[in-house]
Structure formats: C-alpha cells, structure tokens
Amino acid sequence: MLARKFTILNRCLIRNFVRYQSSSLIGESFITKEQISNYLNSETWSVTQYTQFDTDSKVSDDTVLKILKLSGLPNEGIEDSVKLKIKDRLSTQLIFINKLHEVECDYDIDDKYSRIIQRNPKPMTYNEIMLSLKNTEKDSKLGEISGSWEAN
C-alpha cells in the first residue's frame, strides 16, 4: 500500500516536472567576465531622452553665485566656462522640475494603500511595548551584541 502511494506520488512529480519545464528565452548565457562587463557597460538608454526640453529659460549669474555660496562651494574666481556649464545644468534641472510639476496626477487614489507600512498603525500600550522588548532576541547577523543596551 505504501509503495503504491509513492509510485503515484512519483508519477505526479514527474508529470509536473515535465509540464513546467522551462528554458532560457532571453539569449545566450555569458561565458566570460568580459562578456558580462561589456553587457553591463553598454548604454541602453540615456537621460537625455527624457530631458530634451526647450532650453529657453536661462539662469542668471547671480543665481549661480547664490547657489554656490549656499552649498559651501567656492563662488569667487570661477572661470566663465565652468560658470556656463553650471548655468546650463541648473537650467536643465529647473526645466525638468517644472515638467514634473506639469504632470497630471490622479488625486482620487487612496493614499493609505500606497505604502508597504500602514500609515495609521494601532498605537501600542506601554505593557505591549515592554512585552515585545522582552521577547525580542538579539541578531548577531545585524551586529547586535547581547547585553549591549542592558543596564549593569
């Protein structure tokens, strides 16, 4: 009787294995590290695809100097070519931010389902906190040392 059950089980496993057998449809597998490196270093898309906007809005020299001063970077004695690069990059960033503000959003979506963690969790009482702390064990994988927070 037991042998018959194992035979039936083996047949089911073999059928399921054959039925769900899969193969690689993505492409040939990598053989050398160079192939992996070449694949990872090849560009598939560029940020400029998504940031090609009208560059009519220019940033003034005063704005560039204020931002450099606020950021703690040197703001005096900067070459004109460097200042021009900073202005162009800042202008592109501001245009991109303005484009983001122009995107229409669906405000009818319930925000409480947009996070993994609940937004309004049930508050814990003091006794529940103490009980959970008492039952918590130190995890050496996370670098927690037993007795490090306990009073001597």
Curated annotation (Swiss-Prot):
Superkingdom as given in the UniProt entry: Eukaryota
HAMAP family: GatF
GO cellular component annotations of the record: glutamyl-tRNA(Gln) amidotransferase complex; mitochondrial inner membrane
Family to which the UniProt record says this protein belongs: Belongs to the GatF family.
Pfam families, alphabetized: GatF (PF20977)
Residue span of the annotated presequence: 1-21
Membrane topology qualifier: Peripheral membrane protein
Subunit details: Subunit of the heterotrimeric GatFAB amidotransferase (AdT) complex, composed of A, B and F subunits.
GO terms of biological process kind: glutaminyl-tRNAGln biosynthesis via transamidation; mitochondrial translation
Entry function: Allows the formation of correctly charged Gln-tRNA(Gln) through the transamidation of misacylated Glu-tRNA(Gln) in the mitochondria. The reaction takes place in the presence of glutamine and ATP through an activated gamma-phospho-Glu-tRNA(Gln). Required for proper protein synthesis within the mitochondrion.
One Gene Ontology MF term: glutaminyl-tRNA synthase (glutamine-hydrolyzing) activity
Enzyme Commission code: 6.3.5.-
Entry annotated with the keyword Nucleotide-binding: yes
Compartments in which it is found: Mitochondrion inner membrane
Protein name listed in UniProt: Glutamyl-tRNA(Gln) amidotransferase subunit F, mitochondrial
Catalytic activity: L-glutamyl-tRNA(Gln) + L-glutamine + ATP + H2O = L-glutaminyl-tRNA(Gln) + L-glutamate + ADP + phosphate + H(+)
Gene encoding the protein: GTF1
Species in which this protein is naturally found: Vanderwaltozyma polyspora (strain ATCC 22028 / DSM 70294 / BCRC 21397 / CBS 2163 / NBRC 10782 / NRRL Y-8283 / UCD 57-17)
Alphabetically ordered keywords of this record: ATP-binding, Ligase, Membrane, Mitochondrion, Mitochondrion inner membrane, Nucleotide-binding, Protein biosynthesis, Transit peptide
Keyword Membrane carried by entry: yes
